[in-house]
Amino acid sequence: MQIYWTKINKIIEETPEVKTYLLDVPEDFTWEEGSHTHLGLEGFNAGDKPNRSLVRHMSISTLPSEGAIGITTRFRKPCSEFKTILGNLDVGSEVAIFKTHTNVPLKREDKNVYLLSSGVGLATFRPLVLEYFKCADNVNQIHSLNIDSTKDFLFTNIFTSAPDKNFTAQFVDNRKDYYEKVKNLAGDKDGLFYVVGSEKFLVQNIEVLREQGIKKEQIMLDKHEKELPKFFSVDLSI
């Protein structure tokens, strides 16, 4: 397993609770849209075994063409040990990245794509949308729906409806409106539905989508293949 140590190049305060850390790109480090990585803080591998409390699984919120590895995360008090340390790091501090992989690349199957996210989960979809804007080949349209109870919606400069690009962005701040909209979107029985958020959020979305007749093959989760069965364990086959 290769561990890349790199430096924080810039810290962006997206909202009062959310920051994006832009990391220098190590030589020969590559990724594609929809990737996640493991972020390790200083000392995580100092002992015989890795200190898991100093490691987190994070989505990469940038594309390689942007020249930085973006890690976007929410700091909600009380913070974990990991978030407390990360929140105190400055530009120039070193962090480690390793085990980078993508479960949710943008599928180009001549279908409509629906991006369903909760809060900072939207960061996973930022590079997918940017990649779509660069090249829309074999993607009919993209519709993003994000729920964030704080009302401090993220990346609104990118997630703004653009009819000329066949892109729709919606933000809601309550569950009732959110799930009503999900049911409406599920009227497209041939669409591809990407879902990113907490495990509870994933399960609830899958339940609603499956009840509307969406097949599990049409639902994309940012989870390793071996983790998928627990999310689809409730058989709602039509």
Show where each model-derived region lies.
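FNR/FR-type flavoprotein reductase catalytic core
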Residues: 72, 78-238
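Ferredoxin-reductase
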Residues: 2-91, 148
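Structured catalytic/translocation cores of nucleotide/phosphate-coupled proteins
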Residues: 1-7, 18-20, 28-31, 107, ...
